[in-house]
C-alpha cells in the first residue's frame, strides 16, 4: 500500500493527480483551480460542508478517528449562548445522518463487510500519477464503498438527487452532477492496477435533512466507463495547465475570484 498522506494538502496535487483537483478544473473553473492549488484562493468559501462530510467519515473509520476529528476541529462546537459546549446545528444534523445509516441493517452489513478504512491507493492513468483514498474496501470480495452526503435523495426531473449541472448544461443525478463518476472511475482503475482485480463500486448516500434518508447505490460499469472517458479527454489539458504550458480560461463571472480580480478595461466599457 502507498505511504500515508494528507489527502487535502493542496501541495500533494502538484505531485499526484487527485480526483478533487481534477474535478475543480472541470466544474469550478481553470483559473479558480490553479489559484486554489497555489493557496491564494479557496474555491469553497464555507468549509462546513467538507467538515460535515469528514465528521461522518471519521465516525465510520473508527471511534479513535472520530474523537481525534472532534479534538482537531473545535470550531464544530458552539462556544457561546445556551448551546455552549454542544455541537453546532450542522453537526447535530450530521449525527442524525449517522444514526440513519446505522438504523439500516443492509447498509451496515455492507459497511461492516469492508474492514479496510481510509485505504490509500495510487496508480497511473495514461502516464499521469494518481493518488486517492477509499472510505472502505473489501479486498477479498472485491468491492469498495464511498460515503456521500447530499442535499437530497428525492427524485427531481426523474433523477435521484437531481440538480442542474452548469458543466453538462442539463439536469443530472447527484452522482454525475458532482463528478463522482470521475472519482470512482479513477479509484477503480487504481485498485485494478494494485490488485489485478476488478472491483465493484457502492455509494452509501445520506441526505442533509432534518429527517435524513440513506440508501445504497451500486454504480454501473457503463457509468464508470463514462467517467474514465472524461478523464482521458481532459487530463492532458489539465496537466498542461498545472505545468504552466496552457493558459487558463478566465475566472467564471459568478465566482469570488472573478469579483475580486476584475478590473475595468477602458477600451471595452460596458453599454446598457
Regions found by a protein language model. Give the residues of each.
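Metal-dependent nuclease catalytic cores that hydrolyze phosphodiester bonds in DNA/RNA
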Residues: 1-133
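Short histidine-centered catalytic/ligand-binding loop motif
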Residues: 44-45, 83-86, 159-178, 220-222
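Conserved catalytic cores of phosphodiester-cleaving nucleases, focusing on short active-site segments
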Residues: 132-170
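Short, solvent-exposed loop/turn segments at secondary-structure junctions
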Residues: 122, 150, 208-210
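Short acidic alpha-helical/loop segments enriched in Asp/Glu that coordinate divalent cations
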Residues: 70, 154-158, 199-204
